[in-house]
Amino acid sequence: MQKPMGRMMMYRLLVTCILMSLPTVAGAYDFIADGIYYDLVDGHAVVTHNGQTNCYSGDVVIPETVTHEGTTYPVTAIGDYAFKGSTGLIHVTIPEGITTIGYSAFWDCMGLVAVTIPESVASIGEYAFACCYSLRELVYNAVNCEDFDWPSPFVYSGIASITIGDNVKRIPDFFACELESLTTVSMGKSVTSIGAAAFDECVGLTSVHIKDLAAWCTISYHDWTSNPLYYARRLFLNGEEIKDLVIPSSVTSISSFAFLSCSHLTTVTIPNTVTSIGDYAFEDCPSLVKATIGNGVTSMGTKIFNYCQNLDNVTCIAGRPPVFTESGLFYDLGYYADATLHVLSESVTAYQSATYWQDFSLINGDAIFYLLGDINGDSEINVADVNNVIDIIINGGSSGGHSRVPSPYCNGWAIIGDVNGDSEVNIADINVIINYILGSQ
């Protein structure tokens, strides 16, 4: 990874502010209704101004439709410069149906404190909310918005909190680029990709909040500047900071940069369902001390644990060493000398001769693979395991009871007999095994 690019030269801001402060070219509006000026364009109403700046104040509610001379028109756009310089504007309600927010539409609305972008918005112009210094909260719900160009619509604003709606799938290029006031990002559960430089130079970020850990694991980032966690360094799941990370079993791949710079992460457990781990997935996690990799992983990206200087315990229960796409777990060979690799006893020789894995100074064959459902440890799941669970329930454990064993589940441990992972051994676990047996035949 390269060093973060520097902030735009300050003279650009100065020149931009001078140019944008020049009077807007006066133009006629078609009509006014309830204090809002409109132009008519191809049968649609476009919110505009009266030819002067600072023509709106207080709370403005833009309607979904407006009637003029007996004809009702859908309101579909906020035009260029529409609210520019309206320093007395406090709140604006943008309705569903608005598809375009124009160039510098809210430039220098210094009293505006919050804004919600509706799902229908497909285009937001440069500088749309620039220099809105009192703007603190942005709720972004646009589900099909095109990528932004630099400078972004929100540049030089005072936004501190961004909430991404649950129906948003993509966050555009340059979305919050250089938004130094930003401290918190709350991510919607449907985001699948984040564009280039979306959170670049957001140096004030302190936390990222998510609702769905599985969804977070699979977000496609253009690069590291797309992930707000790079600057925030703290990730919260439903309000609780993630420190002992257990990847959900529904996850089959972990994206590149997924947990980059998650500074309070201490342990990572990757289940058997995961088959691939992307580049730099856990890079620069300085508190990470232990990582357990399940037996399903076959492909690993470059420098997954790079700069995890305290990681001294790596367990990989994959029988065949996963193949790296470019380089190993670390960039600095010194990390291999400080960490111990734990593998299955029968796999030691394979890891000792595998590219990059062989760089570990110490490879121990002491890893234990506990197959959930294989209660008696014979590497098969069958009727005998059902009987073992019954014995645990009735007799309290002559077949293992509530013993705990290492596993790529449940914070790195599993209770023998607890097949469904609810921390109890009961008839529900029997049903899981029976259903597995019936389904495997």
Please report, for each region that a protein language model flagged, where it lies by residue.
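Consensus positions within tandem repeat domains that build extended binding/scaffold surfaces
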Residues: 79-82, 102-107, 125-130, 151-154, ...
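Bacterial N-terminal signal peptides that target proteins for export
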Residues: 2-15
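A recurrent domain-boundary module in secreted/ectodomain proteins
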Residues: 179, 353-370
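Structural signature of tandem-repeat unit edges
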Residues: 35, 40-44, 55-77, 87-100, ...
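Boundary at the C-terminal end of the N-terminal hydrophobic targeting segment
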Residues: 26-30
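Cellulosome-associated attachment modules in secreted, modular CAZymes
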Residues: 367-441
